[in-house]
């Protein structure tokens, strides 16, 4: 009898939420990685902000808040998540360490 061994694949989708009519850029639009690898997603914004928040959304479900970083913070951690904020470049990154199949979702950033 043959045993079939497969590699689990985690697909993370990043989309940028446009808040207050800001035009943003997303990078990457789709990310495909192996389970256990780290995933980094980026978002950029055009105007000054007070806070930046990251959300995730599973297919057919509502948004789930992940983490908030204030404009005076550079880095913040929560479990396997790490978010960085560079206000001089108007950009933020979300790092998910040791990705799992359950991390498959659309990811959004929003500013206020």
Swiss-Prot record:
Keywords of this entry: Adaptive immunity, Cell membrane, Disulfide bond, Glycoprotein, Immunity, Immunoglobulin domain, Membrane, Receptor, Signal, T cell receptor
Top-level taxonomic group: Eukaryota
Biological function: V region of the variable domain of T cell receptor (TR) alpha chain that participates in the antigen recognition. Alpha-beta T cell receptors are antigen specific receptors which are essential to the immune response and are present on the cell surface of T lymphocytes. Recognize peptide-major histocompatibility (MH) (pMH) complexes that are displayed by antigen presenting cells (APC), a prerequisite for efficient T cell adaptive immunity against pathogens.
Disulfide pattern: 43-109
Residues annotated as signal peptide: 1-21
Limits of the Ig-like domain: 22-112
GO biological-process terms attached to the record: adaptive immune response; response to bacterium
Coiled-coil portions: none
Oligomeric form and interacting partners: Alpha-beta TR is a heterodimer composed of an alpha and beta chain; disulfide-linked. The alpha-beta TR is associated with the transmembrane signaling CD3 coreceptor proteins to form the TR-CD3 (TcR or TCR). The assembly of alpha-beta TR heterodimers with CD3 occurs in the endoplasmic reticulum where a single alpha-beta TR heterodimer associates with one CD3D-CD3E heterodimer, one CD3G-CD3E heterodimer and one CD247 homodimer forming a stable octameric structure. CD3D-CD3E and CD3G-CD3E heterodimers preferentially associate with TR alpha and TR beta chains, respectively.
Gene from which the chain derives: TRAV17
Biological source species: Homo sapiens (Human)
UniProt entry tagged with the keyword Glycoprotein: yes
Glycosylation sites per record: 38, 42
Main location: membrane
Subcellular location: Cell membrane
Cellular component, GO, one term: T cell receptor complex
Protein name: T cell receptor alpha variable 17
């Amino acid at each position: 009898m043959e045993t079939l061994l497969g590699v689990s694949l985690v697909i993370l989708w990043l989309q940028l939420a446009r808040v207050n009519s800001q035009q943003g850029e997303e990078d990457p639009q789709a990310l495909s990685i192996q389970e256990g690898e780290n995933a980094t997603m980026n978002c950029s914004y055009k105007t000054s902000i007070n806070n930046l928040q990251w959300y995730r959304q599973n297919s057919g479900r509502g948004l789930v808040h992940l983490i908030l970083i204030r404009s005076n913070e550079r880095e913040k951690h929560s479990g396997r998540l790490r978010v960085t904020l560079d206000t001089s470049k108007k950009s933020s990154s979300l790092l998910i360490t040791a990705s799992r199949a359950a991390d498959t979702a659309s990811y959004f950033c929003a500013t206020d």
